[in-house]
């Protein structure tokens, strides 16, 4: 192949059927002044404008009075429900209020199309005319309308649910005509009296259906114990109401209903004779009323009990319709013995929650636990029912020993600063330290066991080796509290400001970086205890009041004198003992003179003066000057003399001679005619070894001579 053919590039044109993709510039007009202003705007300024728009929407939501009142209601409900340390339920309800969308994982209602109207809309309505407990009752009734819509019980005509809110005044709440069950809210309900006169119109302008309200009013006037009435006529209930046999005892649901009353309903209960007949049919305890060829009515002392009966009636009617159609007639069905099963089944259902009250401390009313579960489902779907739960779904976790009040296990491992990036090499280098820390903080307790070693032959060796084994009873081995630390903030108190925690941590780390001497942490147990310490011995500090320190004897020596003194010490160490012997002989002669002086006490002062002159000459012969330390020079010289002659060793034959020198004052005291000494004896015998620098050197005496 040629070079021209090898360099040729083959391009494929796009298919003609490809649709034209709309671009960004096709949707805008470049001559638009708004577009030109945004285009010429700096990116930072454009971002600031976008943030301002977002904050504006958030500010509008936060400043709305409806949001504020609803938030207060949520907080009050959360406080009544129990202690929830995290507060996730309240935050979830706030998110439901802002977004008003269905939660992920739950199917949206068919009529809501992903958006639902909140049931509890009372914070924005006027509630001054409400009686005690009416807010909660309105929320329950509106929630029950929503449940009837979700279950498919809604009907466009004569299907209503009513609740009596005031037994003294006979005020009844019902939904107005023209408002569907899916639109029912707490504020949209209408409050009327027993004869149908409007007491509170609610948030709508719709009126009630008097023909549909007449059965409710008749039942309330007949049965003072009834608080809620639910009237439905679904396909199953209407079909069973048209059967001569009525509700057959062929299922558990039919046995739960108890006594069932039947009444020939003609469309209204306005006449007095009809109401008297209804009162005879219902009796004092009947909770289910079948209206012939019309539908079913369920009664209850509470709203939860009425829902319990209407739900079981609907299920029993559906089972009966399916059973009759499948069996080919009532004669082919197995009818249960009412005398044998009805009392037991009805009694279990009346205990509340299907018998969950047996052996439990919490007593549930009839149908309350099931209704609370349905309200929780509606709240999860975003309906915001406003229902006051008796018990939250999530049980509070038991307090573990690794909570805040128990301190952490002390280790020497410290975490790196969050602001400083950690290199991979340093991270790998600290791997061993992290493994050690994890082992130290392990909740397992180990004990040291000596295990005999095994030799290569398989025989047991007399030597032992140390092995760490897990202790079965930690209380006998460990005295601490081993805690497995999984989170660095495990012991940080809850509901604290993270900024304050970081500032406190950084402050502690700054103190650790500097070598500060402090008294350490103060014990909380020993803080109030006072310890009586014995008085310590007095010590003089370096101040003006203390006694002066002795001066340095070498401070006045010249360099030459110090060198000669050093050489003298070196000669002595080398074994030059002849000079020492001569100096000792001279010292012995002086000692003999002193002994003669002590034998004649009358001439002691004169002899002392002569000895003083002799000693001064002998001191000058030595190159080391004498430093006088004391008040009186005479007394110091005598002290030096006593120190010199106290311990002299002339030879092996000459013994140590102890000489006591008395001062002139002491001599006068002894020789005083009165015999009473003027001063107390303060000086005692002193025994010192003659310093080496005071000994005479024979060679130096010859040089001086």
UniProtKB/Swiss-Prot annotation:
Location(s), subcellular: Cytoplasm, Cytoskeleton; Cell membrane; Cytoplasm
Name of the gene: Add3
Effect of loss of the gene: Renal afferent arteriole (Af-art) of the Dicer-substrate short interfering RNA (DsiRNA) knockdown rats dilates instead of constricts as the wild-type vessel in response to an elevation in perfusion pressure. Knockdown results in impaired myogenic response in the middle cerebral artery (MCA), but vasoconstrictor response to serotonin is not affected in the presence of iberiotoxin (IBTX). Knockdown has no effect on the vasoconstrictor response of the renal Af-art to norepinephrine.
Tissue specificity note: Expressed in renal interlobular arteries, afferent/efferent arterioles, parietal glomerular epithelial cells and microvilli of the luminal surface of the proximal tubule (at protein level). Expressed in podocytes (at protein level) Expressed in renal cortex (at protein level). Expressed in primary vascular smooth muscle cells (VSMCs) of the kidney (at protein level). Expressed in tubular cells and glomeruli (at protein level).
SMART domains (alphabetical): Aldolase_II
GO biological process, one term: positive regulation of vasoconstriction
Superkingdom per UniProt: Eukaryota
Residues that bear Phosphoserine: 31, 42, 64, 402, 414, 423, 442, 461, 583, 585, 590, 672, 676, 678, 680, 682
Protein's UniProt name: Gamma-adducin
Post-translational modification: Sumoylated.
Subunit annotation: Heterodimer of an alpha and a gamma subunit.
Source species of the chain: Rattus norvegicus (Rat)
């Amino acid at each position: 192949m040629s070079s021209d053919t090898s360099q040729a590039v083959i391009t494929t044109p796009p298919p003609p059927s490809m649709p034209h993709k709309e671009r960004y510039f096709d949707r805008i007009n470049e001559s638009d002044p708004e577009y030109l202003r945004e285009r010429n705007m700096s990116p930072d300024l454009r971002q600031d404008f976008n943030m301002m728009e977002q904050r504006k929407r958030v500010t509008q939501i936060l400043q709305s009075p409806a949001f504020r009142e609803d938030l207060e209601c949520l907080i009050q409900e959360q406080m009544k429900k129990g202690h929830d340390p995290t507060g996730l339920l309240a935050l979830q309800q706030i998110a439901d209020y802002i977004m008003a969308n269905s939660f992920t994982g739950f199917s949206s209602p068919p009529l809501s199309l992903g958006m639902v109207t909140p049931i509890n809309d009372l914070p924005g309505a006027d509630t001054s005319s409400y009686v005690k407990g009416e807010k909660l009752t309105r929320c329950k009734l509106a929630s029950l309308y929503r449940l009837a819509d979700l279950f498919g019980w809604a009907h466009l005509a004569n299907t209503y649910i009513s609740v009596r809110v005031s037994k003294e005044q006979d005020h009844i709440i019902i939904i107005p005509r023209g408002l569907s069950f899916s639109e029912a809210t707490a504020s949209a309900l209408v409050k009327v009296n027993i004869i149908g006169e409007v007491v509170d119109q609610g948030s709508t302008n719709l009126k009630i259906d008097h023909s549909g309200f007449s059965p409710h009013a008749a039942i309330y006037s007949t049965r003072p114990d009834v608080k809620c009435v639910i009237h439905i006529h679904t396909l199953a209930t209407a079909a069973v109401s048209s059967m001569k046999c009525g509700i057959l005892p062929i299922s558990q649901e039919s046995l739960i209903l108890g006594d069932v009353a039947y009444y020939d309903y003609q469309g209204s209960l306005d006449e007095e004779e009809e109401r008297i007949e209804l009162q005879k049919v219902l009796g004092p305890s009947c909770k289910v009323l079948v209206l012939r060829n019309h539908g079913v009515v369920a009664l209850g002392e509470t709203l939860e009990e009425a829902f319990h009966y209407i739900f079981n009636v609907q299920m029993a009617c559906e089972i009966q319709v399916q059973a009759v159609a499948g069996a080919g007639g009532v004669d082919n069905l197995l009818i249960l013995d009412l005398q044998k099963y009805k009392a037991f089944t009805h009694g279990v259902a009346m205990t509340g929650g299907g018998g969950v009250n047996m052996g439990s401390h919490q007593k549930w009313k009839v149908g309350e636990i099931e209704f609370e579960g349905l309200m929780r489902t509606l709240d999860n779907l975003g309906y915001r029912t406003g229902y006051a739960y008796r018990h939250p779904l999530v049980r509070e976790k038991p307090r573990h020993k690794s909570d805040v009040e128990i301190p952490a296990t002390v280790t020497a491992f410290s975490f790196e600063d969050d602001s400083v990036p950690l290199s991979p090499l340093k991270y790998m280098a600290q791997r061993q330290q992290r493994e050690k820390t994890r082992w130290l903080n392990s909740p397992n307790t180990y004990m040291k066991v000596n295990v005999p070693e095994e030799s290569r032959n398989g025989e047991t060796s007399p030597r032992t080796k140390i092995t760490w084994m897990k202790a079965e009873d930690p209380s006998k081995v460990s005295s601490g509290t081993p805690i497995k630390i999984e989170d660095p903030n495990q012991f940080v108190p809850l509901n604290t400001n993270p900024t304050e925690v970081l500032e406190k941590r950084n402050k502690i780390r700054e103190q650790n970086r500097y070598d500060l001497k402090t008294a350490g942490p103060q014990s909380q147990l020993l803080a109030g205890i006072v310890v009586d310490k014995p008085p310590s011995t007095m010590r003089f500090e370096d101040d003006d009041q203390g006694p002066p320190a002795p001066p340095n004897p070498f401070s006045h020596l010249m360099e030459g004198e110090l060198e000669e003194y050093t050489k003298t010490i070196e000669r002595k160490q080398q074994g030059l003992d002849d000079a020492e012997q001569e100096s000792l002989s001279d010292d012995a002669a002086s000692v003999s003179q002193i002994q003669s002086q002590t034998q004649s006490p009358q001439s002691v002062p004169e002899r002392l003066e002569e000895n003083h002159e002799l000693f001064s000459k002998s001191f000058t012969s030595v190159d080391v000057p004498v430093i006088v330390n004391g008040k009186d020079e005479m007394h110091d010289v005598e002290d030096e003399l006593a120190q010199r002659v106290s311990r002299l060793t002339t030879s092996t034959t000459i013994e140590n001679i102890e000489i006591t020198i008395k001062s002139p004052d002491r001599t006068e005291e002894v020789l005083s005619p009165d015999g009473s000494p003027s001063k107390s004896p303060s000086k005692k015998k002193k025994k010192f070894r003659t310093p080496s620098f005071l000994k005479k050197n024979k060679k130096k005496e010859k040089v001086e001579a």
